[in-house]
């Protein structure tokens, strides 16, 4: 059997293979509520054979949405439709996961197909918050620097969102601390210029993420895993670095984090990112090698043999696929056939199974 299709157990949750649906924003919600689009989008990837389906960045507070069209989990009223999604995913033999997020200074923007520009409060947007009053790009409105009460609210919002996620049936929680959103903004000295207990030193800049992890882990049953997505580097001198990520991974491991989802960038506009096939795998490999903590590799993983090589050579424990699963929701089934592994197909689709000659 191909390494890509061996099971992986994280705490009390076993993934049937090493293919994970990476969280991908659909910008298709209204007031945070999921709808049929999200059910079909996530459900079809579960039908397609992925082991873990992680729902897109789901806002822990309304002001934490990237766009007015983001999913949310800040009120109990969001839960009934989310339960439909998790039940369907589980019925296909996959594990439902959710990425909890706060967009920080990158909140209150339009969706990509609407131009991605900021939405003013008069147009349905809202004031944004960040560690420091520094806009992501100079042309945008500067965010408000969070005070202690605001920081305490962020921590409480993540914990409350975790409780709701459990009530909705999610079995894996991922904290979004990457891509220039709030928790990443606190990590990087390029966006965090505070002089209090949350700025300056490595320990201070990582304090908020540590407190969020502790709050979420306290809410989670011991048998359920906790993931953290990190941008392993800002790709800019003076920013968050790969060395920082290794050091932070060791800290997070001690706080009960079970896997680091290794992405990069997003905190510096026009950063010189060397985008190419598997360009972020090296960061997953390094964190795994130097800490012993399981990792996930993500970013332009588009080929069955490429994914197999990543897992087989111990560079990462799982691969997270995004664009490739938009192109082919049934990539896991097709990859298994290509790699010579026989997987059960949904009985409704059995007539479409490729036959070996």
What are these regions (language model features)?
Residues 1-357:
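Flavin-dependent oxidoreductase catalytic cores
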